[in-house]
A protein has these predicted regions:
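Loop/turn elements at helix/coil->beta-strand transitions in domains of secreted/extracellular proteins
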Residues: 16-20, 53-59, 89-95
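Substrate-gating cap/lid alpha-helix
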Residues: 63-101
Length: 165
């Protein structure tokens, strides 16, 4: 990311006050998923430098399921994986999922209020330390394979219900 770009941003935002960043982008990156995490990390570092806040919270939305034109079936999944990787390498960051509200034919989930509520809840718990709010959804932590079955372990899954098929 260009240092000059940071100087331009700094001049434009220096009189504003911010407590954190909310970010929803990535659909156009499904074809370059392999560099998404380092690019987003560099962007967050630049923004934090511009705001002179090296630990300012950065919360973002994982892309929703969608049938992307001209893409392999795995491209969007690989981008979602890259977004999880970014979560692991960007300090003081958080991610909300839209896996349950995606639309095959609409690139952005139609339920914007749900996305906003999830981001707000994440910020309230992580930035403002309000306890008792469900700020993250189920996160897969482990998979074991045994006798032709996959046993999947999740964190944050107390409200998760499963259907045996």
């Amino acid at each position: 990311v260009s240092r000059g770009l940071g100087d331009v941003y700094k001049r434009q935002v220096r009189n504003f006050t911010a407590r954190g960043f909310l970010w929803y982008q990535g659909e156009s990156n499904i074809f370059n998923y392999y560099c998404y995490a380092p690019m987003m990390t560099a962007m967050v570092q630049l923004w934090r430098e511009v705001w002179e806040a090296p630990n300012m919270p950065f919360y973002y939305v994982q892309i929703a399921p969608h049938k992307y034109k001209d893409s392999q079936d795995t491209d969007a999944a690989l981008l979602r994986e890259a977004q999880i990787k970014a979560l692991e390498i960007i300090p003081n960051s958080g991610m909300v999922s839209t896996a349950d509200i995606g639309d095959e034919f609409c690139i952005h989930p139609p339920q914007k209020d749900v996305v906003g509520l999830r981001l707000a809840t994440l910020a309230l718990t992580k930035t403002y330390n309000i306890c008792g709010l469900p700020s993250t959804g189920p996160t897969m932590t482990k998979v074991n394979y045994s006798e032709g079955k996959a046993i999947v372990t999740f964190d944050n899954a107390s409200a998760l219900s499963l259907i045996h098929i």
